[in-house]
């Protein structure tokens, strides 16, 4: 079974909205072994909708449409499809009761417009909308498009996602005829080319039914290993074998084989070891602390964060020696080390990290170009002494990208030090 996704809405074509629905649907379908061969974006015009649906139904066994279901004048999908299939409308009583109850609980009258929302195309299966009002539909398109299924869902992401998870995926999973396993391999501190060179033997010997996708992002690159086949046990075993082969080749750069962020791994390790962390930031402007505290449960390990953007703040709040700044500059490994040590001593944390750098677009020099960052790490040793180290990196991006990459470098430093610490 192959699928095509159609995203309907003038707002998508005009660039007023980003289409997040199509990637979500593609991922959900991929998880049950249904590949997406095409994604179409079309306007709210009824003829454009009919043309897009006709094309899709001639090419794929399953077509998934989002957008154009609802009470407003630009919600034209249902009627366009009804006309294409030559069918009437029928009231779906459960949907109407759900809509009526939704408005009664808000002390609003039930109108004919609301009743119209509960009308579905004859012969369809109504998809309950647990996050809104307009129901979706699963339609068998015979006789004109025999053997084809058409799914209509609202364009509101929360409504569509609930329909996919609760109704659509369970409906189509038994029809896919295949099992599929996706396993992410999350890496840190390595570029796409270097990673590809490192695992070239694994990639050259991939078995039939297994693919490897490189997923570059602002902070680096990760991999997605996908395996499909007729027997779940074989699929799982083959997928696991390939993942293990990648980890064997690139292990020191791999921080997880599940979809977790680097900050989640760091926070979970801190919590597991009952350690606390504090951060002293300059060039990242609070981003590092924000990423750590985005992780649920981080209050159990994150003590405090200081944004010491100016040299005066570094001296006053962290105890950085003005002579160190004078001799080496604020963006230097000696300053990063003093920032990390000062943060550790003043916070009482078990480990601390500092960032000082040049995010750009100005401020760079030949010796310290834009994108330079120095990361300091300080941690307590079992004998009460303090271990302090710093490293310098040069990133290549705009100001926003550099700040993300700077924070990623700091998280990498934290993770490496945590794995080295003795207890």
UniProtKB/Swiss-Prot annotation:
Pfam families documented for this protein: CinA, CinA_KH, MoCF_biosynth
Q: Which domain of life is it from?
A: Bacteria
The family database entries (Gene3D superfamilies) matched by this protein are listed as:
CinA-like, MoaB/Mog-like domain
InterPro entries the UniProt entry points to: CinA, CinA-like_C, CinA_C, CinA_KH, Competence-induced_CinA, MoaB/Mog-like_dom_sf, MoaB/Mog_dom
**Similarity comment:** Belongs to the CinA family.
- State the NCBIfam families in the record: cinA_nterm (TIGR00200), PncC_domain (TIGR00199), PRK00549.1 (NF001813)
Q: What is this protein called?
A: CinA-like protein
């Amino acid at each position: 079974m192959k699928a095509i996704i159609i995203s309907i809405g003038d707002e998508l074509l005009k660039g007023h909205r980003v289409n997040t629905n199509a990637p979500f649907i593609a991922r959900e379908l991929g998880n049950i072994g249904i590949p997406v061969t095409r994604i179409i974006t079309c306007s709210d015009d009824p003829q454009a909708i009919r043309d897009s649906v006709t094309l899709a139904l001639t090419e794929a066994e399953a077509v998934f449409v989002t957008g154009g279901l609802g009470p407003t004048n630009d919600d034209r999908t249902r009627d366009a499809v009804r006309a294409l299939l030559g069918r009437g409308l029928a009231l779906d009583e459960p949907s109407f009761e759900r809509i009526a109850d939704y408005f009664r609980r808000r002390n609003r009258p039930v109108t004919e417009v609301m009743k119209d929302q509960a009308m579905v195309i004859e012969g369809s299966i109504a998809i309950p909308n647990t996050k809104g009002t307009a129901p979706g539909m699963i339609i068998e398109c015979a006789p004109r498009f025999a053997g084809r299924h058409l799914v209509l869902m609202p364009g509101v992401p929360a409504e569509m996602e609930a329909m996919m998870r609760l109704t659509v995926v369970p409906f189509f999973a038994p029809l896919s005829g295949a099992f599929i396993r996706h396993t992410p391999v999350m890496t840190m501190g390595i570029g796409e080319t270097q990673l590809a060179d490192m695992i070239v033997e694994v990639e050259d010997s991939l078995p039939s039914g297994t693919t490897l996708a490189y997923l570059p992002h602002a902070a680096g690159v990760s991999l997605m290993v996908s395996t499909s086949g007729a027997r779940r046990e074989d699929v799982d075993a083959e997928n696991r074998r390939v993942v293990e082969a990648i980890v064997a080749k690139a292990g020191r750069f791999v921080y997880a084989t599940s979809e977790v962020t680097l900050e989640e791994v760091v926070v979970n390790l801190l919590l597991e070891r009952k350690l606390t962390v504090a951060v002293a930031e300059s060039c990242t402007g609070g981003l590092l602390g924000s990423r750590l505290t985005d992780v649920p449960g981080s209050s159990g390990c994150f003590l405090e964060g200081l944004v010491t953007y100016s040299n005066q703040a570094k001296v006053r709040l962290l105890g950085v020696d003005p002579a160190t700044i004078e001799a080496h500059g604020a963006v230097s490994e000696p300053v990063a080390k003093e920032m990390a040590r000062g943060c550790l001593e003043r916070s009482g944390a078990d480990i601390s990290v500092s960032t000082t750098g040049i995010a750009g677009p100005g401020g760079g020099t030949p010796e310290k170009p834009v994108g330079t960052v120095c990361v300091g790490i300080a941690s307590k040793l079992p004998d009460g002494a303090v271990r302090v180290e710093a490293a310098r990196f040069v990133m290549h991006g705009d100001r926003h990208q550099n700040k993300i990459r700077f924070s990623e470098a700091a998280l990498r430093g934290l993770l490496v030090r945590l794995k080295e610490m003795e207890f």
